[in-house]
Amino acid sequence: MKNRKIYPWIVVGLLWFVALLNYMDRQMLSTMKDAMQIDIIELQSATNFGRLMAVFLWIYGLMSPMAGIIADRVSRKWLIVGSLFVWSAVTYGMGYADTFNQIYWLRALMGVSEALYIPAGLSLIADWHQEKSRSLAVGIHMTGLYAGQAIGGFGATVAAAYSWHTTFHWFGIVGIVYALVLIIFLRENEEHARVIRAMHTDKSKKIPLFKGVTLLFGNIAFWIILFYFAAPSLPGWATKNWLPTCTLRISISLWLRQGLYPL
């Protein structure tokens, strides 16, 4: 398990599934909207559904820098385990929600917990891999995000076969169980652990937060990368959140025109 040649790839494999769950759990709500709005009538309003999507994204975006700061100062293993456990518990709890407000606040909590994962996960992978394999390792990990989006798209199919409550419950249980698996198999890089201990014992090695932020904002490369990721995210998230609803409405419209929609 601790073999230096094998274990870095085990880390990628372990975190690949976490990345899958990270994006799958957030995507399920948009695909199951039509099933959920039967029981929670507020979801029939596009405005209310937009609020659910927005609260997650605003909190996720605002928390991401804080998540990076936290990941630099604590054990990333336990940060990953904790965030996975919390957002999986939130997913499980959504299956018991029967009001819009309950879904809204659970969605907000999901934004906080899911934001904690990506900085810690990528940092842990970067620590376990050298320059020759680091980009490949990160690239493989990123495929987990897209696999999660794709699988989350089948939430409506599962909800139709069982119920949206059951769908949330089972996907939540999977994440909770996997968090326990990570406790056993995921390891922190010892070199990083030594740096963290040194920071706690030698205060002079700590970089003041304000100074670090100033250096970051003064780096032109930071702004280029920020714009590079922000530009496709604007239409990307609109598509992810609203495409299932738009597709359903267009399909129903076409069926009605052709007289094929089962009334």
Could you say what each language-model-derived stretch is?
Residues 106-145:
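Cytoplasmic helix-loop-helix junction between adjacent transmembrane helices
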Residues 29-30, 219-263:
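Extracytoplasmic gate region of multi-pass secondary transporters
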Residues 2-4, 191-225, 249-250:
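Juxtamembrane intracellular "pre-TM" segments in multi-pass secondary transporters
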Residues 62-98:
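Conserved MFS/SLC helix-loop-helix module at the cytosolic interface between two early adjacent transmembrane helices
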Residues 141, 145-190:
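Helix-loop-helix hairpin linking two adjacent transmembrane segments in secondary transporters
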Residues 27, 57-65, 115, 149-150:
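Residue-level signature of mid-helix packing/kink "hotspots" within the transmembrane helices
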Residues 32-62:
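Extracellular/periplasmic helix-loop-helix junction of adjacent transmembrane segments
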Residues 10-44, 239-244:
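Extracytoplasmic
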